[in-house]
């Protein structure tokens, strides 16, 4: 994706579900006005979920997800069906595609039950409908809004776009990343280490998003490396309102920054933005109970190239061993992979999830809670290990109560 484009994690995720040859790929091409998806009469053309980042009016920036048919057969087919079902965990709006010449069957209704169980907004779209169709009876049977469209002639495609736009969740009351922590005219200092793990020639996504959030709030953002932090603070005429740092230099930054200046990290901001900061604060207490052999799952939302000083696979495990004095067994997941059975783990430590949308991160937290496994966040864990958790939560008075 273009680095100037809306991040995929910030786009409305629209999942297209249905049986093989129901017309899912043709519908995607019609909605987007482009030949993005391969269309064939051969069943099972789409073998894995395919993601298409688009700008579609009146929806705005979206991520269209074309999924394998839910009626795929055989051992490999069952794996494809499972992948299609997993897409529900990151879907904001679902489209159930039904061939109008066949009508819905038990597989369609079973999938619809899964969708409604997750409380997702959904439209049942009957494809291959060249003439007007009365779907009143189907709406009664399925219990959801139904629309008849033709991907060939474009019939009702514009109306479908409008209907989808009406289902977009209201963002007015959603959690801000950083804008609610500053006032217009405030100064914020961002501490960004440039080490071997840092991408060449650019800032990573969390840093970009925090800078934009500060600018949108009318604040001034200063960006510095940890090595230049002291000189940066000395150059400012007044103390900054807040310091936001990379978690891996928490210890140094906490010693350098005056105690009357708010301090937190990019990772903690994202735990509040996409996850559940209260749950992360509760979960981190498990660190003091870790013993030899306890399994700890470290999970990341992206699949970046591992460096010799990688935070997830090298630094964090080393800090945990030193803090606990124990030898736990670490396991890792990355990208879209996330263990279904979490009961074997003593705790889970998750990254800030800048590459995951809120829906998927909330699903992971829910899985951990439902299975009774404490889950926390990189930034929270590192602050806890450094003995500065209370200080890093000062910007969030409601969260501080969890430490009482």
Please report, for each region that a protein language model flagged, where it lies by residue:
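Long, well-ordered amphipathic alpha-helical subdomains in the mid-to-C-terminal portions
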Residues: 181-209
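Canonical P-loop GTPase G-domain recognition
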Residues: 120-180, 187-189, 218-227, 264-265, ...
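Conserved C-terminal guanine-recognition region of P-loop GTPase G domains, centered on the G4
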Residues: 52-60, 79-147, 177-180, 203-219, ...
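Conserved G1/Walker A P-loop phosphate-binding module
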Residues: 1-78, 86-89
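Short, flexible loop segments at the rims of nucleotide/cofactor-binding pockets, characterized by
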Residues: 41, 70-76, 99-103, 167-169, ...
């Amino acid at each position: 994706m273009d680095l100037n484009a809306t991040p995929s994690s910030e786009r409305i995720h629209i999942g297209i579900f249905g049986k093989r040859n129901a017309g899912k790929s043709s519908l995607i091409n019609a909605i987007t006005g482009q030949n993005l998806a391969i269309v064939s009469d051969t069943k099972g053309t789409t073998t894995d979920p395919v993601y298409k980042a688009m700008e579609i009016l009146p929806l705005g920036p979206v991520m269209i997800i074309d999924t394998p048919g839910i009626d795929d057969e055989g051992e490999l087919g069952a794996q494809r069906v499972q992948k299609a079902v997993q897409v529900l965990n990151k879907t904001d709006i679902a489209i159930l595609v039904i061939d109008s010449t066949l009508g819905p069957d038990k597989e369609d209704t079973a999938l619809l039950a899964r969708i409604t169980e997750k409380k997702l907004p959904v439209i049942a779209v009957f494809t291959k409908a060249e003439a007007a169709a009365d779907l009143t009876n189907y709406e009664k049977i399925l219990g959801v809004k139904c629309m008849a469209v033709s991907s060939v002639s474009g019939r009702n495609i514009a109306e479908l776009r409008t209907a989808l736009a009406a289902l977009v969740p209201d963002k007015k009351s959603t959690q801000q990343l950083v804008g609610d922590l500053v006032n217009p005219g405030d100064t914020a200092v961002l501490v960004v280490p440039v080490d071997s793990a840092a991408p060449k020639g650019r800032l990573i996504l969390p840093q970009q998003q925090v800078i934009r959030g500060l600018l949108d709030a009318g604040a001034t953002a200063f960006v510095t490396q940890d090595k230049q932090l002291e000189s940066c603070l000395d150059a400012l005429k007044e103390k900054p309102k807040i310091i936001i740092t990379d978690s891996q230099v928490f210890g140094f930054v906490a010693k350098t920054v005056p105690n009357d200046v708010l301090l937190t990290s990019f990772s903690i901001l994202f735990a509040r933005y996409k996850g559940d900061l209260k749950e992360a604060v509760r979960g981190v207490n498990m660190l003091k109970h870790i013993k030899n052999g306890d399994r700890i799952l470290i999970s990341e939302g992206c699949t970046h190239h591992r460096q010799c000083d990688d935070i997830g696979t090298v630094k964090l495990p080393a800090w945990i061993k030193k803090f606990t004095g124990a030898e736990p067994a670490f396991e890792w997941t990355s990208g879209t992979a996330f263990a279904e059975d979490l009961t074997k783990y003593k705790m889970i430590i998750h990254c800030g999830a800048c590459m995951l949308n809120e829906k998927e991160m909330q699903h992971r937290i829910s899985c951990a809670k439902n299975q009774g496994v404490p889950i926390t966040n990189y930034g929270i864990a590192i602050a806890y290990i450094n003995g500065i958790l209370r200080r890093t939560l000062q910007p969030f008075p409601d969260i501080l109560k969890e430490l009482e």
